[in-house]
Amino acid sequence: MYTLLSGLYKYMFQKDEYCVLILGLDNAGKTTFLEQSKTRFNKNYKGMSLSKITTTVGLNIGTVDVGKARLMFWDLGGQEELQSLWDKYYAECHGVIYVIDSTDEERLSESKQAFEKMVTSEALDGVPILVLANKQDVETCLSIPDIKTAFSDCASKIGRRDCLTQACSALTGKGVREGIEWMVKCVVRNVHRPPRQRDIT
């Protein structure tokens, strides 16, 4: 009887929680993406004005519920001196969203180096990665094929994991919902990193 009640309680009052890192260089649009995610998935969330978002120093945390899953986002600062902190969070995470500023061709190689260092970490083996080519609302941005070509020599280092490169505009919200829903499917089916249980009451 206890097992039945325990199972019923879990079904009704607990969600599977997955930690997802939002990484990328500074000014790529990580925090704007996080704010748009919270606005789109949390009914009563009144987001901060996107014009007031500044460079993240440290960590922003946000939560989004999608069906029976709860995503706990950790938006980490992307400045060079803060990138050394990224790997402290790898062991706990279930997925990575890597944001690229597709309007900043000058820093594309720097972004690629940061991506390559991240994706080759053993602590992230098997963890799904969503690569967002952000700022696609800007006419002069690099296209998805341009981004894929620039990152092509990273392909062999991605290994056996779910990985998707997707167009996005965090400012307008285009591609935000699709990216989150893709990530939810991936983390839920990844048996190598089981979720944490959290009460939702």
Swiss-Prot record:
**PROSITE patterns, A to Z:** ARF (PS51417)
According to the UniProt record, list the residues that bear N-acetylmethionine: M1
Annotated membrane-spanning segments are none
GO terms under biological process: Golgi to plasma membrane protein transport; intracellular protein transport; protein localization to Golgi apparatus
Query: What intrachain disulfides are recorded?
Result: none
Report the GO terms under cellular component. Answer: Golgi apparatus
Q: Quote the InterPro entries the UniProt record gives.
A: P-loop_NTPase, Small_GTP-bd, Small_GTPase_ARF, Small_GTPase_ARF/SAR
State the UniProt keywords alphabetically.
Acetylation, Golgi apparatus, GTP-binding, Nucleotide-binding
Q: Which SUPFAM superfamilies match?
A: P-loop containing nucleoside triphosphate hydrolases
| Cellular compartment(s) | Golgi apparatus; Golgi apparatus, trans-Golgi network
Record Pfam families: Arf
Q: Which GO terms describe its molecular function?
A: GTP binding; GTPase activity
The record ties this protein, via NCBIfam families, to: small_GTP
Record-stated family = Belongs to the small GTPase superfamily. Arf family.
Q: How does it assemble?
A: Interacts with SYS1.
Q: Which PANTHER family match?
A: ADP-RIBOSYLATION FACTOR-RELATED PROTEIN 1
User: What functional role does this protein have?
Assistant: Trans-Golgi-associated GTPase that regulates protein sorting. Controls the targeting of ARL1 and its effector to the trans-Golgi. Required for the lipidation of chylomicrons in the intestine and required for VLDL lipidation in the liver.
Name of the featured protein: ADP-ribosylation factor-related protein 1
Give the species this sequence originates from. Answer: Bos taurus (Bovine)
Q: Which gene encodes it?
A: ARFRP1
